[in-house]
């Protein structure tokens, strides 16, 4: 969908529908809507639809005016009460409004910049989040359907209206919103893709397309080379599958000043997780195609950074394989030597994510990174702890965990810090190796983070994002239909963009 500005007197604005927002229990309309109503919407004042509109969250009302009018419809989108207003509600309301426009087959709906006046959010931020919510809320993963497909009725163009010329920064916001939405949509589609399609090779092809478009350096390390490099953890998991495994390495601006150490993102890319020999139960097993959501988030962040033309030096490392049972699969009781030289006793082959990530983290140190962020659907325990709308973050610096939480909040991705006290390592102690890959059921998410911590030097800022709960949704969330959510794309993107200003060493 294209997004255009239209600058000029409100009497000259043209659109199939003009979208305004309303708060529940408000004594009067938001100031931007009130002004437009007084000056140009007299026909709307007497509308029973407007009088019945209550402003409840995601309530949508369509008011019809004279067919010959420049703007023959007004779409009212409810935000709920002011006390509960947040960025996510604005995104959801914008998505609800644009989905109603889709149902009405409107080709050219519009947001008015003044419609965001009076909200507890800066106007530029409100515009950007409404656009992102609308764009992502309209998208559906239907690429593989062949029957009962309705012709796409999504708007082809979205217009932003304003009476006066805006600043260059404000002018650029629709492009930034489209870039963010594109990254989220890419990640969602990869996660929602079936595992017989979204194989490790498929993810590698996606990475190559990004590299070709943006001039990134790319290396795809196959299993044989990974074994020769000593990646015992990655290889142990990969040997159980017939699908060729690979470690994907993407680097933005490899010719950047080498005095600028890169930010490294490490994303878990288990394209299907049966649990291996420690076989998972059958319930919801089909959803284990989502176990590559960490890698998808990294690719989504690269998609956004590329569209933004960012000059940040960023590396993405994605260990991609299936975790399957079979004659070559690794087994409980095996001892694996990792790329770091540390040995791991395998207690559960269903804790495969940390086995592939540990080698990716060791490989990341070759870049002498300014910081490392790994993102993974690592533990079911995090769902028990935080549910499906909040992810966990663990870090080797408290200030870094706080920064991740804060940046996530800025973009509507909720994260919560969990501790990594040294005492948690006791759960990993082994009689036959340096440590085990799991403990008992106690503190499962934290113990997973503690395992990964062993592979990052204390001198390197590192954070682990456990997105096992947030990577997938079983219900339509307004901006996110059932399936992959794209969680983490915006947090990773902002970490890359804001890192120089965070002052963390």
Swiss-Prot record:
Catalytic activity field: Release of an N-terminal amino acid, Xaa-|-Yaa-, in which Xaa is preferably Leu, but may be other amino acids including Pro although not Arg or Lys, and Yaa may be Pro. Amino acid amides and methyl esters are also readily hydrolyzed, but rates on arylamides are exceedingly low; Release of an N-terminal amino acid, preferentially leucine, but not glutamic or aspartic acids
Residues reported in the UniProt entry to bind Mn(2+) 1: 273, 350, 352
Cofactor binding note of this UniProt entry: Binds 2 manganese ions per subunit.
Cofactor field: Mn(2+)
UniProt superkingdom: Bacteria
UniProt keyword annotation of rRNA-binding present: no
Cellular location(s): Cytoplasm
One cellular component (GO) term of this entry: cytoplasm
A single BP term in Gene Ontology: proteolysis
Residues holding Mn(2+) 2: 268, 273, 291, 352
Protein keywords: Aminopeptidase, Cytoplasm, Hydrolase, Manganese, Metal-binding, Protease
A GO term for molecular function: metalloaminopeptidase activity
Keyword Chaperone assigned: no
Annotated EC: 3.4.11.1, 3.4.11.10
Active site positions, chain numbering: 280, 354
Top-level EC class: hydrolase
The family this protein is said to belong to: Belongs to the peptidase M17 family.
HAMAP family to which the protein is assigned, alphabetical: Cytosol_peptidase_M17 (MF_00181)
Functional summary from the UniProt entry: Presumably involved in the processing and regular turnover of intracellular proteins. Catalyzes the removal of unsubstituted N-terminal amino acids from various peptides.
Name of this protein: Probable cytosol aminopeptidase
Species name: Syntrophobacter fumaroxidans (strain DSM 10017 / MPOB)
Gene: pepA
């Amino acid at each position: 969908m294209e997004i255009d500005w239209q600058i000029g007197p409100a009497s000259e604005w043209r659109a199939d529908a003009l979208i305004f927002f309303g708060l529940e229990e408000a004594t009067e309309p938001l100031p931007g809507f009130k002004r437009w109503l007084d000056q140009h919407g007299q026909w709307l004042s007497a509308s029973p639809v407007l009088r019945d509109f209550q402003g409840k969250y995601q309530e949508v009302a369509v008011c019809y005016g004279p067919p010959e009018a420049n703007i023959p419809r007004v779409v009212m989108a409810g935000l709920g009460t002011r006390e509960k207003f947040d960025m996510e509600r604005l995104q959801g309301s914008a998505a609800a409004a644009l989905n109603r426009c889709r149902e009405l087959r409107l080709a050219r709906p519009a947001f008015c910049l003044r419609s965001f006046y009076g909200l507890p959010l800066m106007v530029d931020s409100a515009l950007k989040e409404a656009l992102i919510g609308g764009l992502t809320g309209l998208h559906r993963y239907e690429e593989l359907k062949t029957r009962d497909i309705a012709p796409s009725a999504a708007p082809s163009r979205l217009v932003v209206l304003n009476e006066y010329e805006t600043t260059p920064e404000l002018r650029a916001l629709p492009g930034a919103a489209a870039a963010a939405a594109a990254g989220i949509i890419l990640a969602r589609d990869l996660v929602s893709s079936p595992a017989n399609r979204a194989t490790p090779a498929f993810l590698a092809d996606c990475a190559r397309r990004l590299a070709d478009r943006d001039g990134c350096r790319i290396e795809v390390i196959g299993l044989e080379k990974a074994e020769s490099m000593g990646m015992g953890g990655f290889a142990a998991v990969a040997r159980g599958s017939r699908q060729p495994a690979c470690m994907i390495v993407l680097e933005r601006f490899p010719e950047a000043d080498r005095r600028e150490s890169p930010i490294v993102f490490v994303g878990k890319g288990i394209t299907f997780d049966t649990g291996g020999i420690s076989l998972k139960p059958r319930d919801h097993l089909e959803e284990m195609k989502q176990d590559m959501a960490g890698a998808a988030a990294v690719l989504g962040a690269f998609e956004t950074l590329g569209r933004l033309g960012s000059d940040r030096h960023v590396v993405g490392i994605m260990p991609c394989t299936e975790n399957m049972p079979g004659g070559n699969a690794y087994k409980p009781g095996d001892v694996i030597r990792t790329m770091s030289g540390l040995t791991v006793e395998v207690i559960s082959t269903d804790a495969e994510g940390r086995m592939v990530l540990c080698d990716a983290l060791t490989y990341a140190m070759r870049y002498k990174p300014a910081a490392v962020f790994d993102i993974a659907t690592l533990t079911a325990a995090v769902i028990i702890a935080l549910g499906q709308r909040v992810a966990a973050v663990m870090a080797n610096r408290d200030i870094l965990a706080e920064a991740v939480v804060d940046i996530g909040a800025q973009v509507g991705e909720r994260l919560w810090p969990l501790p990594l006290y040294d005492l948690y390592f006791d759960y990993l102690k082994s009689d036959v190796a340096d440590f085990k890959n799991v403990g008992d059921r106690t503190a499962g998410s934290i113990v997973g983070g503690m395992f990964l911590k062993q592979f990052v030097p204390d001198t390197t800022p590192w954070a682990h994002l456990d997105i096992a709960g947030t990577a997938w949704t079983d219900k339509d969330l307004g901006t996110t239909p059932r399936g992959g959510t794209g969680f983490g794309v915006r947090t990773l993107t902002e970490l890359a963009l804001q890192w120089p200003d965070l002052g963390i060493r």
